[in-house]
Amino acid sequence: MKTILNKLINHEVLSKEEAKNVLINISSGQYNPSQISAFLTVFMMRSITIDELSGFREALLELCIRIDLSAYNTIDLCGTGGDGKDTFNISTLASFVAAGAGIKVAKHGNYGVSSISGSSNVMEKMGIKFSNDPSFLEKCIDQAGICVLHAPLFHPAMKNVGPIRKELAVKTFFNMLGPMVNPSFPQNQLVGVFNLELARMYAYLYQNTNVNFTILHSLDGYDEISLTGPTKIITSHMEGMIKPEDFGIRLLSQTEIEGGKTIEESAEIFTNIISGKGNEAQNNVVCANAAMAIATVTKCSPQEGFELAKESLFSGKGLKALQKLQELSL
């Protein structure tokens, strides 16, 4: 590790193989917490390269517990987090709305590190069982249209890193990796990223896979469609922008999509919205993100996806998906 750290301190970059090997060594407990912390810190002070990101990703996918859900043509709706915006759990809510619209969802998530309440925090609070048992996860998709993949159950190699990330409480390159290391290898992916540079890197890496992808970045910094301004969209076949008026809705202010100050508050906001009791801003931002997931899988237009998402939310289909998952978790 000393050699690697000296290399990084000298403003050199790692090759793909070096990046992969470092992460494998971290996972096998070869480095102490101080060394791991120093390594993570370097990448907070400069941009990660494509080779480094690719090497880290390969290591995590090699070490993870894989789950085969290929029979379902699933999508994962996942943001990198680390955008510092502290919104409510938009992508998790959008996942249930998409499931209510008939899309099969394999939601990869974790506890919040740089945010108050990550996807797993709110799912746990809602009584959702975390499991890596294939038959349970298949039953969830069969009956609820969605399963929850709690990252630590599938990436046990990262147990050495979890406490350090929590103590640092800022975004690290693991935020960038999260959406790319779904252990079920979904055929479709809706990814939100916290800056344009990362959006380009993701696009480059996904172009070399068979994944049908949509990458999102709101130009004012959100890792999802925020409706607070235009959102950059990159897919395997196009690149463009989408604005609130494209969905026929108004521009939102940042305060309208803020999350709770505690996990309890976050769960309360989640329950209100999925039950159809959210306010206009909350409903619109959830449906806009669900719309992009629906459009990614079905190839309908985002506008058509938005109508399908609204129907799922307001008819209670999204809520039914959540209730079924809660029932299966008992």
UniProtKB/Swiss-Prot annotation:
Transmembrane segments: none annotated. The keyword Chloroplast does not apply. 5-phospho-alpha-D-ribose 1-diphosphate binds at residues 79, 82-83, 87, 89-92, 107-115, 119. One of its GO terms (biological process) is L-tryptophan biosynthetic process. Binds 2 magnesium ions per monomer. Anthranilate 2 binds at R165. InterPro entries: Anthranilate_Pribosyl_Tfrase, Glycosyl_Trfase_fam3, Glycosyl_Trfase_fam3_N_dom, Glycosyl_Trfase_fam3_N_dom_sf, Nuc_phospho_transferase. Its EC number is 2.4.2.18. One of its GO terms (molecular function) is anthranilate phosphoribosyltransferase activity. Mg(2+) 1 binds at S91, E224. GO terms for cellular component: cytosol. Gene3D superfamilies: Nucleoside phosphorylase/phosphoribosyltransferase catalytic domain, Transferase, Pyrimidine Nucleoside Phosphorylase, Chain C. It holds the Pfam family Glycos_trans_3N. Keywords: Amino-acid biosynthesis, Aromatic amino acid biosynthesis, Glycosyltransferase, Magnesium, Metal-binding, Transferase, Tryptophan biosynthesis. Anthranilate 1 binds at G79, N110. Pathway: Amino-acid biosynthesis; L-tryptophan biosynthesis; L-tryptophan from chorismate: step 2/5. Its cofactor is Mg(2+). SUPFAM superfamilies: Nucleoside phosphorylase/phosphoribosyltransferase catalytic domain, Nucleoside phosphorylase/phosphoribosyltransferase N-terminal domain. It catalyses: N-(5-phospho-beta-D-ribosyl)anthranilate + diphosphate = 5-phospho-alpha-D-ribose 1-diphosphate + anthranilate. Mg(2+) 2 binds at D223, E224. Homodimer. Belongs to the anthranilate phosphoribosyltransferase family. HAMAP family: TrpD. Catalyzes the transfer of the phosphoribosyl group of 5-phosphorylribose-1-pyrophosphate (PRPP) to anthranilate to yield N-(5'-phosphoribosyl)-anthranilate (PRA). This is Anthranilate phosphoribosyltransferase. It comes from Flavobacterium johnsoniae (strain ATCC 17061 / DSM 2064 / JCM 8514 / BCRC 14874 / CCUG 350202 / NBRC 14942 / NCIMB 11054 / UW101).
